[in-house]
Amino acid sequence: LFLCPFLPVISFAVIFINSQVGILLFLMSCLFNIILSATLKRTYEDDLKSIFYASNVLKQGYTISKIKHAPQPEVNFKQFRTARHLTSVLAEVNDEDIGAMVIKLVKLIFMLDYVLFHSIQKSYTTHMNELKNCFDYIAELDNHYALAMYRRTLECYTEPQIDDSNDGIVFSELTHPLIADAVANDFSLSQNILLTGSNASGKSTFMKSIAINIILASAIQTVTASKFVYQPGIVFTSMANADDVLSGDSYFMAELKSIKRIVEIPDNQKIYCFIDEIFKGTNTTERIAASESVLSFLHEKSNFRVIAATHDIELAELLKQRYENYHFNEVIENNNIHFDYKIKPGKANTRNAIELLKITSFPAKIYERAKDNVPKI
């Protein structure tokens, strides 16, 4: 294989010694190399995309490194000169262009694709550590650029402060990063919390805001708040559970598995747990009994910080010695419901499900009967 690319040149030289033999050898060597080139290409064709990708990374790294004040990678780009300048030769040419077809024929005759591919591959293998450094260089710059662009889209953000002496989280003006015109909340999560409140009052969004910002704080040192002091930890959630027809799990079974996963977490590192509408998939009596038991169990784990949301006001009373009660509420006026989405101390003292029947134009008979049923239950 080493001599094959030179056969057409050698046979062409023979023409000047013996024209008939030389021409015959030249044609045979050209035909042989064309067939051999096409056959060999199948063995490395799948790797061409990786070669092109690595070459583009090297080109971008080299270009960026030449920018004034740009950080310099630990890469000697001279060692990859062949890869940066000649990888494009390996690209497919346009079969409808006569000039391109001539180039393709020359490449086949002299096996240029095969020679270049293995030359570039050898340089990558020889200088693998520097190639990895270039990938890391581009990845780091891309990460910083993406983070800077993300921060520019935020109306309010800050870098989190780590305080290992703080057993929870303290934040000001925290918002959900994916909600436009989100309502900000101030809070200190120093104890386990039980959230109560009406439907759509903001319980779930508040928990998601905290959970997402803990992850953002750990991942990109950016939170959507004006202040965020926390002890780093791992986030576990049991939210938005759903039944699974394929596996045969009912909603309640899916919820059980989700909460069991949290219960079995070892108590050897900081854990932040968020449980939304705990055990809502079963009847009221057993839901309250099971919820009290699970939340009491989690309370005993010293490294856990738990925020659980429920519609069961009774649960707030049962857990008042272990969990601090907070709530969200609403105001109903003139058949309109208004939420301020602000967290408040204490358990909820309002309910809106029946009033929502009226506001959403259910038949008056249904609304009145539901209202009359409340004292009887």
Question: Whereabouts are the PLM-identified features?
Answer:
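Alpha-helical coupling/stalk and coiled-coil linker elements that connect catalytic or binding modules
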Residues: 1-198, 206-207, 211, 217-234
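ATPase nucleotide-binding head domains, primarily ABC-like/P-loop NTPase cores
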Residues: 16-24, 36, 147-377
